[in-house]
Amino acid sequence: MSPTAGENILLKAEALSVYYGNSLAVKDVYLEVPKNKIVAFIGPSGCGKSTILRCFNRMNDLINGCRVQGRITFHDQEINDGRVDAVELRSRIGMVFQKPNPFPKSIYENIAYGARINGYQGDMDELVEKSLRQAALWDEVKDKLKDSGLALSGGQQQRLCIARTVAVQPEVILMDEPCSALDPISTLAIEELMQTLKEQYTIIIVTHNMQQASRTSDYTAFFNARATEGGGKMGYLVEFDTTEKIFDSPDQEATADYVSGRFG
């Protein structure tokens, strides 16, 4: 039985493979992402976690020589169909990157800019406040909205990037190691925020932090890599299941070894 049986599936990958030029980077991934859940991608460096993550909003389209095979469906629609507009897709499936990357604009404009480009016609002040509240940042910045977003601390900048993402009203938030550059207190703030956000959004997070995956996610996908001829690596999905099962009683020995710290 599928680990997501009975869930409302929002995103699905089937026979998903990614090539860089002629090199196969990730092979034959199958997984389902349920709505309003947090899915963690874990695994050693070079196993394709971030590559697969970027497939879900077609960020790999921007990488020269990158080619995707297989199917990804969002609301049962194939996202690589020529009729799907990639820019519109990215407004529905937003992304938060590893390093906080606020625009060199005011805190207010960091939120308003993307919403304006996406045609938002409502009360902008209201949207800015709502987005900052959703990112648990409003109380810290409400009196300095005209200040540069770059003047904030690293943890605040990352929450500003999350606020910027939710301002365009996506359904899914992709997070590529969002806490790797943050201190433990800022990391905890992001993790607590994720639990609140999943009430309205579906979240996929790539993380190297086993404790973070076990604390925050509902489902976990463990990726590994094997060496290829020519000295490269090919990533593949070892196991996908509920986070409880992955960490407590995984089916694959490699998964047990990784989550227990015996390799990685």
UniProtKB/Swiss-Prot annotation:
Primary subcellular site in the record, as a coarse category: membrane
Entry's localization field: Cell inner membrane
Family annotation (Gene3D superfamilies): P-loop containing nucleotide triphosphate hydrolases (3.40.50.300)
Domain of life: Bacteria
Any single biological process term in GO: phosphate ion transmembrane transport
The name this protein goes by in its record: Phosphate import ATP-binding protein PstB
Biological function: Part of the ABC transporter complex PstSACB involved in phosphate import. Responsible for energy coupling to the transport system.
SMART domains reported in the protein's UniProt record: AAA (SM00382)
Keywords: ATP-binding, Cell inner membrane, Cell membrane, Membrane, Nucleotide-binding, Phosphate transport, Translocase, Transport
Molecular functions (GO terms): ATP binding; ATP hydrolysis activity; ATPase-coupled phosphate ion transmembrane transporter activity
Keyword presence, Transferase: no
Topology relative to the membrane: Peripheral membrane protein
Gene field: pstB
Catalytic activity, reaction form: phosphate(out) + ATP + H2O = ADP + 2 phosphate(in) + H(+)
Single GO cellular component term: plasma membrane
Chain ranges of the ABC transporter domain: 11-250
EC numbers for this chain: 7.3.2.1
Binding site residues for ATP: G43, P44, S45, G46, C47, G48, K49, S50
Subunit structure: The complex is composed of two ATP-binding proteins (PstB), two transmembrane proteins (PstC and PstA) and a solute-binding protein (PstS).
Pfam families: ABC_tran
Family: Belongs to the ABC transporter superfamily. Phosphate importer (TC 3.A.1.7) family.
